[in-house]
Amino acid sequence: MPLRPIIILPDKRLRLVARPVASVDSEVRALMDDMLETMYEAPGIGLAATQIAVDRRVIVLDVAKRRDDSAKADPICLANPEILWASEELSSYEEGCLSIPEFYEEVFRPEKVRVGYLDRDGRRREIEADGLLATCLQHEIDHLNGVLFIDHISRLKRARIIKKFEKAAKLDAQEPKRAPHSPHTDAQKPGAASDL
């Protein structure tokens, strides 16, 4: 299970709408395993395939387990997830994203959701969620639709964040390339922000 590099804003691939999975086969299960390993290593609590530049509607989450936590891992792998129902009541959570490291903003989303998806065995399932799990599901499904959490904040704050990442990308492009044996990409530096 290799670690996959996580793409960072302003990478335009983050804005693409992912294609559905035709069936959950060994290739999709291997992708899910790679995504879980990448998410745990980052560390994060959710990851969408689009964040590792894979054009498939696949997300993985584990809100119970965080790096250096004593909690037992309880991962959820979802192919073709879709929100079937969302409550009118909203709740807020300070969200972060592995593709937008070190930035956190309060985002309002439906407090409860019901999501339909295919599990690792290709069976159709539904999950009802509230709290952090509901927030995480919505955040990751947004990624599959080319939507980032910063799209849910004010235009001024969003523009400031995008400008900062565009400037950093230009500076990175001007710097000499890292040695190929470097153990970390920018997205996987120790202490990187957790993804919701």
From Swiss-Prot:
UniProt KW keywords: Hydrolase, Iron, Metal-binding, Protein biosynthesis
One MF annotation (Gene Ontology) recorded for this entry: metal ion binding
Gene3D superfamilies (UniProt xref): Peptide deformylase
Enzyme Commission number, as recorded: 3.5.1.88
Reaction(s) this enzyme catalyzes, per UniProt: N-terminal N-formyl-L-methionyl-[peptide] + H2O = N-terminal L-methionyl-[peptide] + formate
Disulfide-linked positions: none
Cofactor note: Binds 1 Fe(2+) ion.
Signal sequence coordinates: none
Binding locations of Fe cation: 97, 139, 143
CDD domains: Pep_deformylase (cd00487)
UniProt-listed GO biological process terms: co-translational protein modification; translation
Superkingdom of origin: Bacteria
TM region(s), chain numbering: none
Residue segments, region Disordered: 171-196
Cofactor(s) of this protein: Fe(2+)
Classification via Pfam families: Pep_deformylase
Function recorded in the entry: Removes the formyl group from the N-terminal Met of newly synthesized proteins. Requires at least a dipeptide for an efficient rate of reaction. N-terminal L-methionine is a prerequisite for activity but the enzyme has broad specificity at other positions.
Family designation: Belongs to the polypeptide deformylase family.
Full protein name: Peptide deformylase
Protein's organism: Methylocella silvestris (strain DSM 15510 / CIP 108128 / LMG 27833 / NCIMB 13906 / BL2)
Gene expressing this chain: def
